[in-house]
Amino acid sequence: MRYNQFSYIPTSLERAAEELKELGFDLDLQKTAKANLESFLRKLFFHYPDSDYPLSHLIAKNDMDALSFFQSEQELSKEVFDLLALQVLGFIPGVDFTEADAFLDKLAFPIHFDETEIIKHIHHLLATRCKSGMTLIDDLVSQGMLTMDNDYHFFNGKSLATFDTSQLIREVVYVEAPLDTDQDGQLDLIKVNIIRPQSQKPLPTLMTPSPYHQGINEVANDKKLYRMEKELVVKKRRQITVEDRDFIPLETQPCKLPIGQNLESFSYINSYSLNDYFLARGFANIYVSGVGTAGSTGFMTSGDYAQIESFKAVIDWLNGRATAYTSHSKNHQVRADWANGLVCTTGKSYLGTMSTGLATTGVDGLAMIIAESAISSWYNYYRENGLVCSPGGYPGEDLDVLTELTYSRNLLAGDYLRHNDRYQELLNQQSQALDRQSGDYNQFWHDRNYLKNAHQIKCDVVYTHGLQDWNVKPRQVYEIFNALPSTINKHLFLHQGEHVYMHNWQSIDFRESMNALLCQKLLGLANDFSLPEMIWQDNTCPQNWQERKVFGTSTIKELDLGQELLLIDNHYGEDEFKAYGKDFRAFKAALFEGKANQALVDILLEEDLPINGEIVLQLKVKSSENKGLLSAQILDYGKKKRLGDLPIALTQSSIDNGQNFSREPLKELPFREDSYRVISKGFMNLQNRNNLSSIETIPNNKWMTVRLPLQPTIYHLEKGDTLRVILYTTDFEHTVRDNSNYALTIDLSQSQLIVPIASN
């Protein structure tokens, strides 16, 4: 374990003493440091009628237990404080450590003993993570140190778990959206699942916009998947034009219906544990699946601003600007009289994507988004540089396939009976509009590109993204983060994992940082919390997070690739082609081992190479035919210890998100030896070699200069490392699988790898 503590708010002595007193700690500025520490420790054992017993189970020195120490005349020293602090946080002498000083250095322990600062040390200790993954104060509250009185209690600028999660209100409302996406002449209704504490205080809301939450249709999804085996089409030379079109909602009328009291209820919905954490701290949770999902009406428009509007309508309702009904019969309306109107959205992948889309509307009431692994341009999710390009792990998927997966109205037999014919018509229109044949950008994709509206974002923004996420690739967050207005508060956590959540990782206090931010933004707490704009997980060692100023630098280093002419054959033998098509993982293994069709260049680094931004391959290339696709991957190659990309569970249920509520495992990325690490990758149709909107011809056997931008990253390579460049054509995971008989030739003497370099 290593501390990377970003959430602690430096506190004055007077404020620290006041907050400790509010928690019931009997500390006195006139007492000695030793007496105050003893009083603090005894309070920790509030379950015991006699605190001597648990105190005797701690050691103050290697030869003295804590009870004996406090009964002695010995003075409090750094050695004693450190040893007791470690034990209070759950670290066991002789098991987790033998030498406390060395262990504290390894932990990067954030508290440095000064006898005159004991009150502040105790305050800081309570806000510090235990071995279990919870802060000490959260651990104590979870054990019942504070009663669940359904009111707010704060410590170090963060809300504590004092809301009763055993008596939650679970209710359903149906919000009227200014849409008619299925064109049936009726405004669409949006189902909203609400979970909130029983409190007299107006509550802020965490909203998870999740098209998955009302169920998914995996059978329809699998039937809709496309075969990747097809020839790369030769496109006609042309210029692509699109236009920015404002989304115009339909008119709605003020509702004059009586207020209803009897709301639909529910017993369970699959929740997000970060939401659960905040539910216990006085934040209502709502789950919304939007148009075209079970319980709602309309068509699944998948990514456009009509879908976004269906979530926006819910924020409007929370602020009194839209109508919600108690049921589909629309006999009674219901108002969000429990809400304070301020909303933060949460969730990963599609969920985070909807958060980004919502933010670009500038809707009043949306105070903050926490968007994890989020898409900012749907074209860049299903296409790349004029190519059909599947997200990592999902060959054959496209946006209409996702529509089939998430159009959960068809899971309700009655809805299927009444609406499936119309749904199939609209789905067919969507399939035609996305143009899987060419892979080109068009108006359909432009209408699903949130980057063009990034300037309208006015809420606070928190993004998390994995630099090993080849599903929602790093370009998605790179482009939206760098497009955000300079006037807003923005934060980015870049980790070394893949498409995963990070709120329950041991090495970073993400939950607590979000708590401090949300208390600021949604509860109006003046806590003086300041979070760095960008925090990056160091790839060279375990559990080390660093502040960074920018994602993408203008300083570059050009690396020569060699002097040879290298030939890349596109064609595989029939058996090999079929084998790779059945198992793209076998293809990846062969590719990285130098066995698949490829041109391979290894560069031994003579100095450190701190990459920050978008690597570009500038290549001199020619094709034997009038078509060609180019794929590239950059590897950190050779056996050494690296971070894994999937977090593993260190404990099974040590994190309590409330008071015995929604327990979850503590996780972390492992650090272990492997043979290589993908740093970046990229794909291009050579007919789109100059830009996305220009379709050009490929002259047979004529040299072309190609600039292939790869996925942005921050990655530190060290002197002596090997940077492996792999150039090839068909990628069996991502691209169409064209087995036609053509070849590319690369002139390495006229080619370079252009690397953005991080400044010191």
Swiss-Prot record:
GO biological process: proteolysis
Catalytic residues as annotated in Swiss-Prot or TrEMBL: S349 (charge relay system), D469 (charge relay system), H499 (charge relay system)
Keywords recorded for this protein, A-Z: Aminopeptidase, Cytoplasm, Hydrolase, Protease, Serine protease
Record's catalysed reaction(s): Hydrolyzes Xaa-Pro-|- bonds to release unblocked, N-terminal dipeptides from substrates including Ala-Pro-|-p-nitroanilide and (sequentially) Tyr-Pro-|-Phe-Pro-|-Gly-Pro-|-Ile
InterPro entries with a match to the protein in the record: AB_hydrolase_fold (IPR029058), Galactose-bd-like_sf (IPR008979), Pept_S15_Xpro (IPR008252), PepX_N_dom (IPR015251), PepX_N_dom_sf (IPR036313), Xaa-Pro-like_dom (IPR000383), Xaa-Pro_dipept_C (IPR013736), Xaa-Pro_dipeptidyl-ppase/CocE (IPR050585)
Keyword Oxidoreductase listed: no
Presence of the UniProt keyword Manganese in the record: no
SMART domains recorded: PepX_C, PepX_N
GO cellular component, one term: cytoplasm
GO MF annotations, alphabetized: aminopeptidase activity; dipeptidyl-peptidase activity; serine-type peptidase activity
Compartments reported by the entry: Cytoplasm
Coiled coil (residue ranges): none
The protein's enzyme class: hydrolase
Known EC number: 3.4.14.11
Function: Removes N-terminal dipeptides sequentially from polypeptides having unsubstituted N-termini provided that the penultimate residue is proline.
Oligomer status and interactors: Homodimer.
Family affiliation: Belongs to the peptidase S15 family.
Name by which UniProt lists this protein: Xaa-Pro dipeptidyl-peptidase
Originating species: Streptococcus pyogenes serotype M2 (strain MGAS10270)
Gene designation: pepX
